[in-house]
Amino acid sequence: MSRYRGPRVRIIRRLGALPGLTNKTPQLKSSPINQSTSNKKISQYRIRLEEKQKLRFHYGITERQLLNYVRIARHAKGSTGEILLQLLEMRLDNIIFRLGMAPTIPGARQLVNHRHILVNEHIVDIPSYRCKPQDFITIKDRQKSQAIISKNIEFYQKYKIPNHLIYNSLKKQGLVNQILDRESIGLKINELLVVEYYSRQA
């Protein structure tokens, strides 16, 4: 399954706020699906499916990518759900978004693809690159790159930067300070339901 390229508002009306996908907020009105199921018990499968879809659309990844992340998380020590979220949050495109250097994760992915971003002074053009503690995220020393990201920071760095990240506005430099904790996730999600959804596939 490829990445979703349709209307983003339609997605957030169904799944709720997804800041990684769009900075728009859903209108509080019932969709036809909600109206038709208001008097019916929603199946457990559907609940798990919607939680899975939240992760997919928020982080802008394909079904195959998400399944691979679940498999990696299952083989790691610790809570599978929390490790899954850590893997997604430590993607380079998400780090750029959480630092306020891009308005959305798709916007951050575009910056990476166009080679505007350096990690530890080396250009990285892979959005899924897994960042680690003590990685420095900087902007390519080019006027166009600097202008794009400076404008983004001015408009979009209004949300509190999570504790595992640090941004130096003078140097225009981000730092991955540590592995994030569960409280720093920028999405309302029940990751255990996602793990349960993939229980027979991972």
From Swiss-Prot:
SUPFAM superfamilies in the record: Alpha-L RNA-binding motif
**What CDD domains does its record include?**
S4
User: Which molecular-function annotations from GO does this UniProt entry contain?
Assistant: rRNA binding; structural constituent of ribosome
Q: Which GO terms describe its cellular component?
A: chloroplast; small ribosomal subunit
Q: Which residues form the S4 RNA-binding domain?
A: 90-153
* One Pfam family of this chain: Ribosomal_S4
The subcellular localization recorded is: Plastid, Chloroplast
Under the heading SMART domains, the entry gives:
Ribosomal_S4, S4
BP GO annotations? ribosomal small subunit biogenesis; translation
Q: What InterPro entries does this protein's entry cite? A: Ribosomal_uS4, Ribosomal_uS4_bac-type, Ribosomal_uS4_CS, Ribosomal_uS4_N, S4_RNA-bd, S4_RNA-bd_sf
* Keywords, sorted A to Z: Chloroplast, Plastid, Ribonucleoprotein, Ribosomal protein, RNA-binding, rRNA-binding
**PROSITE patterns named among the record's database cross-references:** RIBOSOMAL_S4, S4
State the similarity comment: Belongs to the universal ribosomal protein uS4 family.
Could you describe the subunit structure of this protein? Part of the 30S ribosomal subunit. Contacts protein S5. The interaction surface between S4 and S5 is involved in control of translational fidelity.
- Could you tell me what this protein does? One of the primary rRNA binding proteins, it binds directly to 16S rRNA where it nucleates assembly of the body of the 30S subunit.
Protein name from the UniProt record: Small ribosomal subunit protein uS4c
Q: Which organism is it from?
A: Splachnum sphaericum (Pinkstink dung moss)
